[in-house]
Design a protein with these regions (language model features):
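Structure-specific nucleic-acid interaction/processing domains
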Residues: 1-110
Length: 110
């Protein structure tokens, strides 16, 4: 397993960013120094909420979706959802994924 870290940043104006890195200290410094993602350049980091070691490449999207569920899709970026402005198709996909993840529907056919 790769030594990937997932990090969650609290940003200005109630925004959040989820990222992944093999070099957490270096990458976090980039965000805090204005050299990070477009989202963290627009909304400056306030604090590191979580740093999660021993993750895999898929965990970034998982944590991004979890944060979107908690804080709203307009307030969180990360993983496959890094664009400053999400298009309608992307918003539809995110909402569908969130509904599917929280659905209590039985899977009787399986």
């Amino acid at each position: 397993m790769e030594d990937i870290h997932i990090y969650i940043l609290q940003l200005e104006k109630g925004k959040y960013y989820v990222g992944k890195t093999k070099e957490p200290e270096f990458r976090l410094n980039e965000h805090f120094n204005g050299d990070g993602s477009e989202w963290t350049r627009k909304f400056k980091p306030v604090s590191v909420l979580k740093l999660i070691p021993h993750c895999n490449a898929y965990d970034e999207d998982k944590y991004t979706l979890m944060m979107m569920e908690q804080h709203g899709i307009f307030n969180v970026r990360g993983g496959s959802f890094c664009e400053l402005k999400l298009d309608d198709r992307c918003k539809f996909t995110i909402n569908k994924m969130l509904r599917g993840a929280t659905s209590s529907t039985k899977l009787d056919n399986f």
